[in-house]
């Protein structure tokens, strides 16, 4: 029964199919364009009959071929792919509309209007467009085309040459090559496919002729027929490509479902990133010498010393620098209050030196010490301001101009060497002048205070380019002489001014002259790079992001260099050569042959390095690094940043390469001054030191974060052991290269401020590395080699005859002190334990004397500040009433010092001559006795001075900070316990992060909150960080030398807690005397207010 029904059904289906085929053939004949097919080349290929199919016929409408699309608007013509569609694959017909195939030829009207022609209607004999617009549907174009083709064929048969257009040659060449490539991949399909060329041949000829006829309708162009074989190949290739495109389209549509099915069958779990394990919650910082690291250094290198022998020199240096910091801050605070409240302007500003001295100081700015600032300072402009200031007949300076003049005089006094003679040029005579040390000190301080006054006055003044220059110079001076925490406030104002001037937008520079464009762009580049530098130093988010500006892109620099600078060079380049240069590297190489434009190239690479530094901060040191990213993602970010740094160095032109920059610059500077050569060398070295600093930082960071998350090593897709091994080698190699640079670099009196931070990162990292490998004598040769490099670098930094030892810069003296302390300690350890000690013969006793001389010079600098404060802020009559400043009783007396009250003579005398008592004498008070004694003394002092309850609240804050978790001081530099971090931004390496602005930057309005809010802030901060206080936030990883494969032990929370307790115990005596013995103030509250006022 089933068999009979099946046979019957099959016969019925075949009858329907045959009937459908006959009807389809009749319909094809009826719709054929008889009068137009004669224009085609050769006989037309008959349409293929439909393939039998099991699909039911269309119930209504025109009878169609089963291979054609069922859509009603599809043209009734045979598709080229009909022969390739088997009966069981009729679903392909439903997507044939996507091919959008055209009619073989268009009528004259549609061709003229350039609209799509349609099939000829059988009834009217016209296309739809001709019917719609009531036009004659003619094909004169195709008739003329056929005539010309037949004429060309006759000429070819008679042996006459036929000149083919170039276009036909190119098309033939391309088509033949394409056909060869397709044939090699589809040989079987090519052989089995019939040569269907009619439709495509018609379309190709029509389109080609149509393009030439569209220009001139009445004049027909010469047409050369295309070989039949070529047309067949073109049509065949078209068929193959069309089929493949359709198949790919279908595959892409079903790709998502296919992947999901494969995942289900193979039981692959697709893990959402949100649920993946994160690294241990920890915010990494750039600090190197935290209390924990000092404790490790003592345990590994100086275990033979007692606590007194180890801490005595550190205690003495810290005491002096700490007092200096208070004095310098007091100087700025008192003047700020005075300038805001004084009714008379006569008592606000300090007088400037006479005109000849002022001009000498301004000219001294042109020196390598200020290499990075010379493009900001226009000395000629400042000299004009000086003439106007000293000659009222020439006018009066604006606030911005006076601001710039004072800060430039301040910088000039800073770089002037009092030991060298100075030529003073006056109107009538030349004078040889020698500055006194204290005279330069006074000039620098007075002009700085004048600059602070104009800085506060900017809030009501109009900002302009002059004010922007002055703000940038003030920020640089504050960073070098006071602290980065104070300087960052000035920098934020400078950035606001730059944004108001729209220096961040490329459109601002369109209508300016070339000189003005270069000046403004370099100012903006300096703002951007300085912001990134402070972000590195303070471990805080930068103010500016990449999306804030479109001036520092490669395209913008290419436009500036290629279109505006290169055409103005003395050596003219061909326009064709300039047009062919489109990448920044090629443009830079052309421009690098001119020394006068080297600063612009350095500016470009500095901005490029700044962008990489910004990425490093967000991917490594942001507070959300361990919250948002997995360990693998963090490692990938580190590797990407390392590649970006390597690409930048590879793109440096030869003149800026580290290997031969001096020789190249010397050749290019034959026609330039010696100063230009020295400045170019300094800026090149600074660029490389900054680059090496980032490479070293990334190496230390990746080792640290892997060491903190060894439990995720097995699940990582990276080769963790290889990454650690390579990072260690990169760290050591880069540090050695930096030391080789430093020991051969020619130092200048104050050029240390420019590269001190980057240099000290390398120096202190190497000392910590030595403390790791000196536990045993396995690496004795390597240890001796590195100590020798550190010794040579130290000798170069001291200068000939130790002339740089007495540089009047407390930051430099403090940094050099710790350098000397570590070098002496390492040499002592090597001499005691290494078998190669006699071979190297390091003299550690020499550095004991250097330490003593450094402490002496630091104390003298502090005493000079006391004298300046006396002459600046104490009324002369009041001073005379006191008589002698110093008495023996005052020198020994303990004084409670509140920095927010009016300073007295006794306070100054105490700060000048008193020192912290010896910590290990028998008479030293116990912590409890000292606390009560100092608390009572502070209370008495508050009653006599009329202090408000702020002091009591501050004392409570001190108690909270001391009794709480001390390790939190590694985040906030305020609680630094063994060096003057508050005065040294470069001592971010020497101490805990100078990061006290992190909260201030986010919310400036909270800086002036009452003390109750400050109490809450301190307590809440302690509670929030309670679980994280037991880890060391130093950038240098513990166990760097022993971090080999799986042998590195994972450290538990108890290990961190024990280490923290031991390090706190080592330094608690210094903390006790600072917080409750001699000085009384809340350091958190104090430095927040310092930042507000600055």
UniProtKB/Swiss-Prot annotation:
Region called Disordered, residue ranges: 1-33, 927-1035
One GO BP: positive regulation of transcription by RNA polymerase II
- Molecular-function annotations in GO: DNA-binding transcription factor activity, RNA polymerase II-specific; sequence-specific DNA binding; zinc ion binding
- Cite the InterPro entries for this sequence: AtrR-like, Transcription_factor_dom_fun, Zn2-C6_fun-type_DNA-bd_sf, Zn2Cys6_DnaBD
Domain of life where this protein originates: Eukaryota
Alphabetic keyword roster: DNA-binding, Membrane, Metal-binding, Mitochondrion, Nucleus, Transcription, Transcription regulation, Transmembrane, Transmembrane helix, Zinc
- Topology relative to the membrane, per the entry? Single-pass membrane protein
Composition bias of kind Polar residues appears in 1-12, 19-29
Annotated Gene Ontology cellular components are: cytoplasm; mitochondrial membrane; mitochondrion; nuclear membrane; nucleus
Query: Residue ranges under compositional bias (Acidic residues)?
Result: 990-1031
List the protein's name.
Answer: Uncharacterized transcriptional regulatory protein TBS1
- The record lists the organism as Saccharomyces cerevisiae (strain ATCC 204508 / S288c) (Baker's yeast)
């Amino acid at each position: 029964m089933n068999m009979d029904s099946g046979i019957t059904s099959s016969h019925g289906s075949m009858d329907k199919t045959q009937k459908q085929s006959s009807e389809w053939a009749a319909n094809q004949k009826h719709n054929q364009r008889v009068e137009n097919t004669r224009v085609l080349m050769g006989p037309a290929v008959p349409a293929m009959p439909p393939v039998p199919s099991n699909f039911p016929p269309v119930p209504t409408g025109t009878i169609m071929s089963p291979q054609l699309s069922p859509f009603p608007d599809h043209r009734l013509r045979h598709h080229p792919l009909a022969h390739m569609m088997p009966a069981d694959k009729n679903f392909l017909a439903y997507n044939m509309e996507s091919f959008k195939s055209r009619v073989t030829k268009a009528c004259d009207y549609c061709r003229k209007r350039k609209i799509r022609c349609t099939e000829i209607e059988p009834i009217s004999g016209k296309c739809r467009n001709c019917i719609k617009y009531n036009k004659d549907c003619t094909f004169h174009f195709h008739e003329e085309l056929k005539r010309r083709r037949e004429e060309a064929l006759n000429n070819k048969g008679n042996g006459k040459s036929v000149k083919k257009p170039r276009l036909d040659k190119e098309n033939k060449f391309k088509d033949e090559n394409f056909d060869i490539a397709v044939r090699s991949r589809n040989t079987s399909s090519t052989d089995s496919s019939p040569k269907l060329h009619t439709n495509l041949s018609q379309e190709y000829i029509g389109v080609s002729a149509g393009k030439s006829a569209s220009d001139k309708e009445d004049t027909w162009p010469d047409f050369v027929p295309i070989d039949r074989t070529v047309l067949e190949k073109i049509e065949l290739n078209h068929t193959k490509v069309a089929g493949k495109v359709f198949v790919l389209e279908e595959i892409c549509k079903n790709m998502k479902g296919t992947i999901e099915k494969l995942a289900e069958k193979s039981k692959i779990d697709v893990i959402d990133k949100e649920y993946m394990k994160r690294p241990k919650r920890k915010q990494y910082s750039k600090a190197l010498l935290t209390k924990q690291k000092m404790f490790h250094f003592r345990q590994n290198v100086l275990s033979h010393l007692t606590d007194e022998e180890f801490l005595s020199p550190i205690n003495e240096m810290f005491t002096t620098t700490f007092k200096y910091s208070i004095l310098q801050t007091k100087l700025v605070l008192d003047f700020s209050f005075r300038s805001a409240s004084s009714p008379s302007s006569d008592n606000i500003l300090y007088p400037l030196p006479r005109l000849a001295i002022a001009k000498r100081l301004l000219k001294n700015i042109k020196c390598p010490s200020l290499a990075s600032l010379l493009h900001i300072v226009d000395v000629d402009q400042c000299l004009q301001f000086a003439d106007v200031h000293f000659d009222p007949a020439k006018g009066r300076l604006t606030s911005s101009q006076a601001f710039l003049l004072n800060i430039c005089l301040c910088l000039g006094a800073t770089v002037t060497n009092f030991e060298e003679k100075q030529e003073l040029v006056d109107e009538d005579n030349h004078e040889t002048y020698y500055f006194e040390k204290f005279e330069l000190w006074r000039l620098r301080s007075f002009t700085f205070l004048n600059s602070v006054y104009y800085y506060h006055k900017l809030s009501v003044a109009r900002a302009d380019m002059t004010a922007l220059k002055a703000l940038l110079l003030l920020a640089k001076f504050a960073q070098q002489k006071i602290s980065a925490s104070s300087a960052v406030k000035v920098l934020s104002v400078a950035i606001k001014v730059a944004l108001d001037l729209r220096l961040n937008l490329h459109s601002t520079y369109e209508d300016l002259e070339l000189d003005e464009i270069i000046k403004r762009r370099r100012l903006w580049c300096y703002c951007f790079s300085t912001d990134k530098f402070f972000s590195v130093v303070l471990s805080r988010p930068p103010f500016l992001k990449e999306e804030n500006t479109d001036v520092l892109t490669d395209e913008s620099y290419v436009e500036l260099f290629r279109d505006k600078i290169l055409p103005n060079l003395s050596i003219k380049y061909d326009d064709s050569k300039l047009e062919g240069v489109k990448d920044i590297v090629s443009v830079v190489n052309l421009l690098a042959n001119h020394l006068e434009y080297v600063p612009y190239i350095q500016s470009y690479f500095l901005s490029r390095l700044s962008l990489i530094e910004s990425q490093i901060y967000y991917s490594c040191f942001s507070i959300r690094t361990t919250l948002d990213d997995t360990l693998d993602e963090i490692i990938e970010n580190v590797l990407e940043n390392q590649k970006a740094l390597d690409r930048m160095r590879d793109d440096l032109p030869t003149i800026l390469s580290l290997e031969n920059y001096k020789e190249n610059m010397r050749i290019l500077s034959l026609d330039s001054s010696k100063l230009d050569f020295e400045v170019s060398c300094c800026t090149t070295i600074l660029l490389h030191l900054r680059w090496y600093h980032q490479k070293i930082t990334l190496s230390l960071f990746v080792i640290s974060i892997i060491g903190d998350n060894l439990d995720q090593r097995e699940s990582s897709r990276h080769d963790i052991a290889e990454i650690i091994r390579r990072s260690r080698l990169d760290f050591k190699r880069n540090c050695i290269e930096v030391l080789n640079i430093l020991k051969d670099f020619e130092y200048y009196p104050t050029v240390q401020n420019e590269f001190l931070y980057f240099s000290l990162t390398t120096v202190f990292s190497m000392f910590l590395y030595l403390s790791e490998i000196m536990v045993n004598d396995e690496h004795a040769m390597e240890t001796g080699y590195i100590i020798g490099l550190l010794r040579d670098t130290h000798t170069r930094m001291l200068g000939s005859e130790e002339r740089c030892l007495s540089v009047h810069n407390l930051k430099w003296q403090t940094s050099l002190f710790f350098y000397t302390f570590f070098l002496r300690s390492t040499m002592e350890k090597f001499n005691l334990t290494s078998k190669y000690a006699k071979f190297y013969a390091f003299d550690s006793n020499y550095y004991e004397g250097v330490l003593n001389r450094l402490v002496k010079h630091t104390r003298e600098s502090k005493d000079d500040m006391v004298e300046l404060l006396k002459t600046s802020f104490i009324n002369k009559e009041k001073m005379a009433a006191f008589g002698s400043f110093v008495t023996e009783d005052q020198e020994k007396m303990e004084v409670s010092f509140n920095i927010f009250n009016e300073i007295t003579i006794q306070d100054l005398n105490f700060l000048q001559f008193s020192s912290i008592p010896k910590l290990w004498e028998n008479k030293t008070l116990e912590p409890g006795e000292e606390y009560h004694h100092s608390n009572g003394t502070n209370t008495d002092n508050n009653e006599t001075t009329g202090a408000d309850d702020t002091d009591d609240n501050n004392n409570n804050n001190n108690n909270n900070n001391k009794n709480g978790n001390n390790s939190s001081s590694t985040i906030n530099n305020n609680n630094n316990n063994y060096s003057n971090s508050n005065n040294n931004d470069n001592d971010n390496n020497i101490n805990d992060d100078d990061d006290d602005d992190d909260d201030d930057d986010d919310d400036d309005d909270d800086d002036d909150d009452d003390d109750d809010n400050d109490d809450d802030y301190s307590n809440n901060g302690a509670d929030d960080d309670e679980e994280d206080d037991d880890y060391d936030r130093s950038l240098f990883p513990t166990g760097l030398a022993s971090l080999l494969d799986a042998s590195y032990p994972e450290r538990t929370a108890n290990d961190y807690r024990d280490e923290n307790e031991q390090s706190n115990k080592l330094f608690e005596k210094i903390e006790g005397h600072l917080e409750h013995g001699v000085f009384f103030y809340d350091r958190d509250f104090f430095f927040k207010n310092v930042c507000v006022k600055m």
